[in-house]
């Protein structure tokens, strides 16, 4: 009998005892009272003793599809097992998922009999907007009560460090409480809502205050990752992760929820508009609201991108004065960056700015993660890009030739540069086909932008831009980009952010974006 079978066995045993009592040998229970002390079963020690009470309500993971939500058990269930040693591999049995809450399931079903199918879908979309606000508010409050406050009280982090990581999160809660209150006020007793357009037009402009929070995310994520090297911080966060309230989401998932919610508003509003009849007065207001939120998202994207670019420029270390380049200083946008390896197995961190490619090595300087230049910066306009076929390069730099199949490596591309006596060639390897294609697209588009600005768009191929598979796959524009920003919520620890190449590129998704384990290689 294994440990997990014990509770069931104990229950059955007690039940059998209760059934056998009437069939006993006739000894009355008042004749021989038991003097044995009954010990209450011990409960498993939990993090609840360290964390202030938090309302255990459903948590919604906004970075996934709109219709998918997740929740956790709202009641603590006493554990009848004896206390056991805490394990990092332990999983909480109290955590469970449930389907999204629908409008038609929440309110009286009879109302469906007098509404058209299109109107029901409209009510569902409006309810999704309202429910999302409620979940967001609960998540933000949870982040403060379950993470910020305990770490401050236990001196796990300093107040200054926590302010840097959590940013202006507190100021966002009242904004969303205001919208939720207005949406509830206009909801009829039967649960239906007639108009939401005027409310949204009046409320959406306040989201401009998101710029400071989103612009701080790059620095916040970097500091949080650095603090995880502290055993106390890592231990606290791991215990939280394994506790029911976290829904198995780590701290950064909670801190990234506001950004994820921001980029979803255009999708939510378009869904409401799609099911709104043309003769409904709400249609004009919804169209105006969509224009407002798209403008706000675009502006915040730009500011966030500039903030990210400044952050990494400040952390570049130059071995010699000659490595400094005015193209780096003048850059306002970081198109993409991530860890790669060269063909000698050296880990590199590559930055693609607007007009220059910078290859670095990650180093620790004054207890901060910095990036030491590995080679001279390469101007994008003079860069030659080659998409290498799998097996064309092997470790050590040899070209395809006398080596066995098991020596072949995949996902390589090559960047080279020659200007007079100066020349460089780097064979770089991505961790998979997708990341390789992201790098190729990003570099191609960056070069096209630079050459187009110089009136040389027709010289792309003659400049050495070798066309490879997927050349036509460019980053989406306009509304499509806003939708795709929400789709890249992979939980990878990659630092590669390759979804932006211009000022309009979606910088929001890239704050927590993805290039961990990218493996490019270099051949000089």
Swiss-Prot record:
GO cellular component, as recorded: cytoplasm
Basic and acidic residues compositional bias, start-end: 472-484
Annotated compartments: Cytoplasm
Top-rank lineage group of the source organism: Eukaryota
PROSITE patterns: DH_1 (PS00741), DH_2 (PS50010), PH_DOMAIN (PS50003)
Entry keywords, A to Z: Cytoplasm, Guanine-nucleotide releasing factor, Phosphoprotein
Residues covered by the DH domain: 121-303
Subunit structure, interactors included: Interacts with RHOA and RHOB.
Biological role: Acts as a guanine nucleotide exchange factor (GEF) for RhoA and RhoB GTPases.
Protein name, per record: Rho guanine nucleotide exchange factor 3
Source species taxonomy: Eukaryota, Metazoa, Chordata, Craniata, Vertebrata
